[in-house]
């Protein structure tokens, strides 16, 4: 696969991440397999849109455009997909940097024409310099990173993780775009699962489709100090439960919770056992990790129950949009 086949979409929303955004773009421009283009999609922030347009107006292959849909990450990604030119569309978080061979490893996965998506491994960069002793690796998804329990290597999966992922353009032709109403909206309650819902929808539309995670496609994701705290851990776990309820409503609880059942019955009990063992051996954080796993499970379950009730009552909605080309509106007001 040539460099001309890959577009990279980075969705941004706040000037507070200015240096992170510049670092993310620089990491894409330094790839051993160059991207066709990098698209910065600004989520309804006119000041940031104007500033980024000035920053990159002389830079080849970096395009800045406004989110053409409702506020939120899903609509921003859909805007990037519609405006992109590559046959493969990769997504990178705005507070992450990609290793040099990130796109090369993505591209290798598409040698098989049945492969419709390839994700990678996301490693945390803790603001404090180290992982909090109580924070279990099994819950690294709380901070947008690859969690303990995912299989190593290049493996087939139910869904990729959105901040470090790529899709064939034809995947969106078959399944539509990311569902709005599920994912994040700036700094509001940290919902997620929009990529899970999309991937399940994709494999239903294309039963022969293969989705992969290749752990050699590595990005490093910054975890701010506020997200190292137990309060955020609980909030994010609760929001995950709310999101999973929406996914189950869309695709059914069987497929929607298939991976989560394995995770809850195999990975998490082993994590609790390790934490308790470490506590007995007087190793730092063991009891805290075991308690955090139990708390995370119960909190997510509570969110799922409430989300399911809301969904049945019609209090939670989302929609799937078809991806259509959008006009080139670089520098337009958000």
Regions found by a protein language model. Name each.
Residues 89:
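Short aromatic/hydrophobic "clamp" motif used to bind/position activated sugar donors
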Residues 1-27:
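N-proximal low-complexity "stem/linker" segments adjacent to membrane-targeting elements
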Residues 162-167, 171-175, 182-217:
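A short, conserved alpha-helix in the catalytic core of glycosyltransferases
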Residues 136-157:
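Short, flexible, basic/aromatic active-site loop/helix in glycosyltransferases
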Residues 67-84:
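Glycine-rich, basic loop-to-helix element that forms the pyrophosphate-binding segment
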Residues 235-239, 253-334:
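Non-catalytic, C-terminal membrane-associated alpha-helical segments of glycosyltransferases
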Residues 25-66:
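Acidic donor-binding segment of Leloir-type glycosyltransferases
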């Amino acid at each position: 696969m040539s460099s001309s086949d890959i577009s990279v979409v980075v969705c941004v929303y706040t000037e507070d991440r200015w240096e992170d955004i510049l670092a993310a773009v620089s990491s894409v421009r330094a790839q051993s397999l160059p991207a066709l283009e990098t698209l910065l999609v600004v989520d309804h922030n006119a000041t940031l849109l104007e500033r980024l347009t000035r920053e990159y107006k002389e830079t080849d292959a970096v395009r800045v455009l406004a989110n053409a849909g409702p506020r939120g990450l899903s609509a921003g990604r859909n805007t990037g997909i519609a405006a992109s030119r590559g046959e493969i569309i990769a997504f990178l978080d705005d507070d992450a940097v990609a290793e040099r061979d990130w796109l090369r490893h993505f591209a290798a996965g598409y040698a098989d024409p049945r492969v419709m998506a390839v994700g990678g491994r996301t490693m945390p960069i803790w603001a404090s310099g180290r992982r909090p002793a109580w924070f279990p690796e099994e819950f690294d998804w709380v901070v947008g990173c690859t969690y303990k329990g995912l299989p190593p290597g290049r493996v087939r999966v139910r869904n990729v993780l959105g901040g470090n992922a790529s899709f064939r353009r034809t995947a969106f032709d078959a399944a539509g775009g990311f569902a709005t109403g599920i994912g994040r909206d700036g700094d509001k309650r940290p919902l997620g699962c929009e990529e899970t819902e999309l991937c399940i929808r994709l494999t239903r539309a294309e039963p022969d489709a293969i989705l992969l995670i290749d752990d050699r496609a590595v990005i490093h994701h910054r975890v701010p100090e506020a997200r190292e705290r137990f309060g955020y851990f609980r909030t994010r776990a609760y929001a995950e439960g709310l999101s999973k309820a929406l996914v189950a409503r869309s695709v059914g609880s069987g497929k929607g919770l298939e991976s989560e059942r394995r995770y809850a019955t195999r990975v998490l009990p082993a994590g609790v056992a390790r934490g308790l063992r470490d506590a007995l051996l007087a190793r730092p954080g063991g009891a805290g990790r075991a308690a955090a796993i139990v708390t995370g499970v119960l909190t997510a379950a509570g969110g799922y129950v409430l989300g399911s009730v809301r969904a049945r009552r019609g209090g939670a909605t989302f929609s799937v949009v078809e991806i259509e080309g959008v006009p080139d509106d670089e520098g337009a007001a958000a």
